[in-house]
Amino acid sequence: MHIYVDADACPVIGIVERIAKSHNIAVTLLCDTNHYLTSDYSEVVYVGAGADAVDFKLISLCEKGDLVVTQDYGVAAMALSKGAYAIHQSGKWYANENIDLMLMERHISKKARRASSKNHMKGPRKRSDKDDYNFEVSFERLVEKLLQENAGKD
């Protein structure tokens, strides 16, 4: 198992690295050239700036059984289609059973924003310590689940 992080503006990199290190799991952080990341643990891969360039690079690298951390539903859907697992920075696990609904809701919201004369919507609320805690608990559970599944294959 390998962990890939869609690292552009990802607030949970430290949590991912800490948990991955405790389980001796390799991590790759992917970001575009507009960002600068350093890590003592993870491999950092820079991808040329461009719409979805990081997303497509991440998907080209991940394989069945890998774990992808992303807030992008499209990336999650592509990862799931390759047999990888995916988790949102909120801690929500993406699954084949919920991804279609999530993509449809995203599409409907995008259409509503385009149709609205008020395009000055608020952004997301500030991330809290509780958000980090929720992600940490959920991520740890998912990692342990995947490690147990992989142990059964040996």
Protein language model annotation of sequence segments:
Residues H2-D154:
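Nuclease catalytic cores that cleave nucleic-acid phosphodiester bonds
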